[in-house]
Design a protein with these regions (language model features):
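Feature captures the catalytic cores and cofactor-binding loops of soluble hydro-lyases/lyases
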Residues: 344-434
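C-terminal accessory/binding modules appended to enzymatic or scaffolding proteins
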Residues: 294, 300-313, 317-366, 371-373, ...
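A short, GP-enriched loop/loop-strand-helix hinge that lies immediately N-terminal to
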Residues: 5, 19-59, 74-79, 353, ...
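Short amphipathic alpha-helix with an adjacent loop that forms part of the alpha/beta core around
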Residues: 11-19, 87-93, 388-396
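ATP-dependent carboxylate activation and anion-phosphoryl transfer catalytic cores
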Residues: 1-11, 15-21, 32-34, 45, ...
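A general structural motif
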Residues: 4-9, 56-59, 80, 311-317, ...
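General beta-strand structural signal in soluble alpha/beta enzymes
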Residues: 4-5, 26, 47-50, 77-80, ...
Length: 434
């Protein structure tokens, strides 16, 4: 039977009272279902698959950090704080930028990257006004390559259908990232390290079923971002492209079948003879007041899959399927406006666009940085102060917009206005330099 009920303790208990199940599977209900584990366990309801104790070990920061330390697996330094002064002290001790987020976060909700004391104060004022009960986590933000692994384990062996690499660097929610399988810039030695770490974590957490692990590579070292003791949104994607029925295998493992008897082997699964790219789909044309800048907070509402003989073909198919316009018009113009942190990096991107025949337009500070090395660029006024930006969009002279900005409220309003007009006109607005 199928029930359409909210995942609240009382509603779930009513269903259990009617159905009288032998146990409950929480691994396929996302983070909301995982948060019910302690409650169900305290009521004597058997948890099928990974135990409540193991789930708590993966979710509890101190216990999980102790596990990582035992295996000498790196993680970005961080602290849990409850007040404004503690947050500022932690941020300055760790060094900016830092990642701020509530404990037990869902979908990256209320997660931000802060670059200075003022941004920490602004964030903590919002969080503290909501009367938080759990600590706010302050983590050192490391900008590196991000990877994601879905693992099936029976407690003795593990099967890793595939390792996915994000095109965007860390700091963008995994649901909003473009994910590529197999990874496109990871060497065999690092790939083996990822497999070894995944096996250690899955087995030491006594996983029975699915577990999702997110990694980053920073300065040649592997770091664990987080471990989710459940199925992730990438399970349908990786199942489709590898041919491994992950949900079916995980369910069989949860009820006691050994992984080796299921016919898909153990360890890292064989690579297919093609490349698969997962591209997020956004709904900003309907959610007009949303801030479209990619961040640790998830904003996508769907995803599409592109397959190709190589990464370029798969990415092209994925972008077109997601609704992006990827051809040049007769004018072939690109509007660029980036914050100070991104200005050194935009120079090489602008040079490549210039070599491809695009006409470049940029706001004052960005234009100065681009022209410093001799790239031709036409200066337009700042957002919110010069209508020329919108005139260029309306005239059809802009094919793409590259836009990254500060977290100042005034700037965000201008950003939302510009992004919404781009969506209305069908002009791709890129908010991440990757």
């Amino acid at each position: 039977r199928l029930y359409f009920e909210p995942l609240f303790p009382e509603d779930v208990m009513h269903i259990i009272a009617v159905e009288k199940p032998v146990g409950v599977v929480v691994a396929f209900g996302g983070q909301t279902a995982i948060k019910l584990t302690k409650f169900l366990d305290s009521r004597g309801i058997p948890i099928l698959g990974t135990s409540a104790e193991s789930i708590d070990m993966a979710e509890d920061r101190e216990r999980f950090d102790a596990l990582l330390e035992r295996f000498s697996i790196k993680r970005a330094a961080g602290r849990g704080v409850l007040g404004m002064n503690e947050a500022l002290e932690a941020a300055n001790e760790l060094g900016y930028p830092v990642l701020l987020r509530p404990s037990y976060v869902i979908g990256g909700q209320n997660m931000v990257i802060a670059h200075n004391d003022e941004e920490v104060r602004r964030y903590m004022e919002i969080i503290l006004s909501g009367k938080i009960e759990n600590p706010v986590l302050v983590d050192q933000y490391l900008m590196g390559k991000e990877l994601e692994v879905d693992v099936i384990s029976d407690g003795t062996d593990v099967l890793i259908p595939g390792v996915m690499q994000h095109i965007e660097r860390t700091g963008v929610h995994s649901g909003d990232s473009i994910a590529v399988y197999p990874p496109f810039s990871i060497g065999d030695k690092m790939l083996q390290t990822i497999v070894d770490c995944s096996e250690k974590l899955a087995l030491s957490l006594k996983t029975r079923g699915l577990i999702n692990i997110q990694y980053l590579i920073y300065q040649g070292e592997l770091y664990v971002i987080e471990v989710n003791p459940r199925a992730s949104r990438t399970v349908p994607y990786i199942s489709k492209v590898t041919g491994v029925p992950m949900v079916d295998l995980a369910t069989r493992v949860m009820v006691g079948q050994p992984l080796k008897a299921l016919g898909y082997g153990t360890g890292l699964y064989k690579r297919p003879p093609y490349v698969a790219v997962k591209v997020p789909v956004f709904s900003f044309e309907k959610i007009t007041d949303a801030n479209a800048a990619l961040s640790p907070e998830m904003k996508s509402t769907g995803e599409v899959l592109g397959l190709g003989a190589n990464m370029q073909e798969a990415l092209f198919k994925g972008l077109v399927s997601a609704g992006y316009k990827v051809e040049k018009s007769g004018h072939a113009g690109v509007l660029i406006s980036v914050n100070r942190r991104d200005q050194p990096e935009i120079v090489n991107i602008a040079r490549k666009l210039d070599e491809m025949g695009f006409r470049l337009y940029a706001t004052d500070g960005t234009a100065r940085e681009i022209s410093r090395l001799g790239t031709d660029v036409e200066v337009v006024g700042k957002l919110g102060r010069d209508n020329r930006v919108f005139q260029l969009l309306e005239s059809g002279r802009i094919d793409y917009v590259i836009l990254t900005g500060s977290t100042e409220p005034e700037y965000i309003r201008d950003f939302i206005h510009l992004n919404h007009r781009c969506v209305q006109l069908g002009i791709p607005c890129l908010t991440s330099l990757d």
